[in-house]
Amino acid sequence: MSEALLVKVGGSLRGAEALLDELAAYPGPLVLVHGGGPEIGAWLGRLGYESRFVGGLRVTPPEQLEVVEMALYLTGKRLAEGLSRRGRKALALSGRDALCLKGRALPELGRVGEVVEVEVGLLQDLLAKGYTPLLAPIALDAEGPLNVNADTAAGAVAGALGWPAVFLTDVEGVYRDPKDPRTRFPRLTPKEVEALKGEGVIQGGMIPKVEAALSALRAGAPWAAIAKGERGVLEAVLRGEAGTRFTL
C-alpha cells in the first residue's frame, strides 16, 4: 500500500478535474485539508464586504464568519462529491465536527485563530471505514468557531496523525533558477531554507509556502513537501521526482 498522506489542496474549483482525478486514484489513505479563498472572497463581495488580509491571514470580523464558513462548506461538499463520483468515498467536515480542531483566537484579526489541539479519533474512524475525510479549517474556542489558515491547519493535522504533509500549490517546488528545471531542490532542511532566504532564492510568495511545510515538521509530521497539483504528482513526490521535500 502507498504511504498515508495528509494533502492540503487549494479552494479553487476551477480546473479541479485533473486534481480530483489524481486524488481519487491515489492507492493509499488520504486526509485532505482544503482552503476556500476564491469562494470566500466571491461571497463576501456579493454581500458588500471587503476582503482584508494582515500577514497573509484573512481578517474575519464576527459578522463575516458565517459567510466564511458557508463558503468553506460549499467548497468541501463539492470536492467530496467530485471524489465520490470518481470512486473514492469522501466526507466533507470541519473542525466543529466531533470538536476535532481546538483553537486559540488571534483577536487582533477578529474571529481568526490557530490550532492548538487536534482530536484525530473521528478521522481515524472514517479512514478505518474506507472514507476519505476532507476537513475545512474551522477550529473552536470557548466562544465558538475560528477561521484558521488552511496551510497551518493542515500542518497541525499532519503532526497529530504523524503523517507526511503534501501541500499542493501552483508552483512545482523550490528552484535556484525557476526558469531552469534542472535547479530544483529535491530536499531541504530548515537550516538550508534560512540560507536560501538569505541569498534571495526563497522570496516573495514562495516564503509562506515553505513556512507552511516547516510548520508541519514542527507539529510532528515526518516530512513535508510542496509540489504542483497535477496528475501523477503524489506518486512522483514519493519517488523524489517532483516537488521539494522538507525534513529536519
Swiss-Prot record:
Top-level division of the source organism's lineage: Bacteria
Alphabetical list of Gene3D superfamilies matching this protein: Acetylglutamate kinase-like
Cellular compartment(s): Cytoplasm
Site (Transition state stabilizer): 8, 209
E.C. no: 2.7.2.8
One protein family per Pfam: AA_kinase
Record GO terms (molecular function): acetylglutamate kinase activity; ATP binding
Principal location class: cytoplasm
Catalytic activities: N-acetyl-L-glutamate + ATP = N-acetyl-L-glutamyl 5-phosphate + ADP
Keywords of the record: Amino-acid biosynthesis, Arginine biosynthesis, ATP-binding, Cytoplasm, Kinase, Nucleotide-binding, Transferase
Annotated Gene Ontology cellular component terms: cytoplasm
A Gene Ontology biological process term: arginine biosynthetic process via ornithine
UniProt binding sites for substrate: 36-37, 58, 147
InterPro entries per record: AceGlu_kinase-like_sf, AcgluKinase_fam, ArgB, Asp/Glu/Uridylate_kinase
Transmembrane segments: none
Pathways per UniProt: Amino-acid biosynthesis; L-arginine biosynthesis; N(2)-acetyl-L-ornithine from L-glutamate: step 2/4
Enzyme class: transferase
Role played: Catalyzes the ATP-dependent phosphorylation of N-acetyl-L-glutamate.
Family: Belongs to the acetylglutamate kinase family. ArgB subfamily.
Protein name, entry field: Acetylglutamate kinase
